[in-house]
Regions:
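Short, charged/polar, low-complexity loop and linker segments
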Residues: 328-333, 385-393
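Generic structural concept
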Residues: 345, 349, 381, 385, ...
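A glycine-rich phosphate-binding loop feature that marks nucleotide/adenosyl-phosphate handling sites
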Residues: 124-129, 284-286, 335-336, 370-375, ...
């Protein structure tokens, strides 16, 4: 069976990772883990984009060779992954020979087919975005948007890829593949963009202006445009491993959906006769008090500051709980602390402590067998009978924020159940019926805790492993079975305590 192949965008090796980079990696890792739990074999790719004018300029400014510069930056991105408990199967760099070979082969194929031609171009160029601009890119007052940085007018001969030739095909493809881009409104934005005629894509830069790139195979006086180079990574990483391509999903930011991924990439593949990816997930931006968080605006947050203070699982939980995939979301230290304290420490952490403490205190540290389920137990089981299937269905639609909300509601209900049953009171009673209720309550608490962490293990894997360990539980291979209420923990010895989410000694970073 073909592996479920999922990719992040590769990160541009021109600066340090920020919250947006971390979110994309965590989101993709959560999807990959979720699919593995469903029984799929998964191939998860990430990496770094290492060519282009900005890299060349940054290296020169530091007085070092471009390769040395990208080696250091790429390692910084690579080092981020284990800190976030993100576990890709492959990490590709566009300076690797395996990638450069495939880029050159693809360029030669398109050139031989007449899809690439040489022509003189006169127009405006953005160094920051490393792209040629059109008049429609201007602001209404005639100025250039700030995102383009310095814009200069140039005249030079270059090689162009025939985008416009395939525009009608792309429109037809998207119209006949509803839901190809997630969320659906992003696909509508792509089709809206395609209502205007496409310009052919300049896919080269003269070596006299840019040396740091992959030379064109048919003219070594030019190097490849960084976007054409970078997009090929998804294919070059697996082309020598039959059965993995096509990608099932590219997970990218909304800012690189149009035109790079939804126009350039799809047309490049179509023109070359290569099967298209099966879908694109375009996530939103993290804002900080309403402003986009990015390197260029200077308000980018270092994700490792949060990980160092609160741990990878708390960070992963917040990202998945707070952002609806595809929408923008605002990050504030205050909101992070609210989620951390109210949901992780006070809700989940409290249930863990109660379960371990009371099992140790009233049952000698061994999970009892549930005996006579009464209305409180039945109500909690009925709630889980709705919650468990919802977690799976929501995950299949990438609605992890809602799945976490439902799971935490179940944890809240379990804590309310504990208050209602009051094991500390039942433990003082000599009535055999109360002793049976006590044993049933302790078994119910432990089982509810096991189910809750099973439902969140793709988001908070470290926490799930710790909780299972203190419950003496080794999860089975079939995740759906782990989500079924049962008496799996009866007879297990539990640890007396586990501190999962300690109170922070200082506020979250600003």
């Amino acid at each position: 069976m073909k592996p479920f192949y999922i990719t992040t965008a590769i990160d541009y090796a021109n600066g340090s990772p920020h919250l947006g980079h971390a979110y994309e990696k965590v989101l993709t890792d959560v999807i990959a883990r979720f699919r593995r739990q469903l029984g799929d074999k998964v191939h998860f790719l990430t990496g770094t984009d290492e060519h282009g004018q900005k890299v060349q300029a940054s290296a020169r400014a530091r007085g070092i060779a471009p390769q040395a510069f990208v080696d250091a930056v790429s390692q910084e991105f690579r080092d981020l992954l284990p800190r976030l408990d993100v576990r890709p199967d492959d990490f590709i760099r566009t300076t690797e020979l395996r990638h450069q070979r495939v880029v050159r082969e693809l360029l030669q194929r398109l050139y031989d087919q007449g899809e690439i031609y040489r022509a003189e171009y006169r127009g405006f160029y953005s160094t920051r975005q490393e792209q040629f601009l059109q008049e429609k890119d201007r602001n209404p007052d005639g100025t250039w948007p700030e995102l383009f940085g310095e814009v200069t007018e140039i005249t030079e001969a270059n090689y162009f890829f025939r985008l416009r030739k395939h525009q009608d095909w792309l429109v037809s493809f998207l119209q006949s593949h509803e839901g190809y881009v997630f969320p659906a409104f992003r696909q509508s934005q792509v089709l809206e963009f395609l209502k205007e005629p496409l310009n052919d894509l300049c896919i080269s830069r003269p070596r006299e202006r840019l040396e740091w790139g992959i030379p064109l195979p048919f003219d070594d006086q030019y190097v490849t445009y960084v976007w054409f180079d970078a997009l090929v990574n998804y294919y070059s990483a697996v082309v020598d491993r039959p059965g993995i391509w096509p990608a099932d999903y590219h997970v990218i930011g909304k800012d690189i959906l149009v035109p790079p991924h939804a126009v350039y990439w799809l047309i490049m593949l179509h023109a070359a006769g290569i099967e298209l990816p099966r879908g694109i997930i375009a996530h939103g931006w993290w804002l900080q008090r309403g402003a986009k968080m990015s390197k260029s605006t200077g308000n980018a947050l270092n994700p490792l500051d949060l990980v160092d203070q609160f741990g990878a699982d708390a960070f992963r939980y917040f990202l998945m709980r707070e952002m609806n995939v595809g929408q923008d979301s605002d990050f504030t230290p205050e909101q992070f602390l609210v989620r951390y304290n109210s949901e992780l420490a006070n809700n989940l952490g409290n249930l863990v402590n109660r379960t371990l403490n009371m099992t140790t205190r009233f049952a000698g540290g061994t999970v009892p067998t549930a005996e006579a389920a009464e209305e409180p137990e039945t109500a909690l089981r009925e709630l889980w009978a709705q919650t468990g299937p919802d977690v799976v269905a929501l995950g299949e639609r990438f609605q992890f924020h809602t799945a976490l909300e439902r799971t935490m509601a179940f944890v809240t209900a379990t804590n309310a159940y504990v208050e209602r049953r009051a094991p500390w009171k039942l433990g003082k009673s000599a009535d055999p019926a109360d002793q049976a209720r006590l044993r049933t309550a302790l078994a119910t608490m432990a089982e509810a805790l096991r189910l809750a962490v099973a439902a969140m293990q793709h988001v908070i894997p470290g926490t799930a492993a710790k909780v299972n360990a203190v419950l003496g539980h080794r999860p089975g291979a079939v995740w759906r079975e782990e989500l079924v209420w049962g008496g799996r923990l009866a007879g297990n010895a539990v640890a007396p305590a586990l501190v999962l989410f300690p109170r922070p000694e200082k506020p979250a970073v600003a």
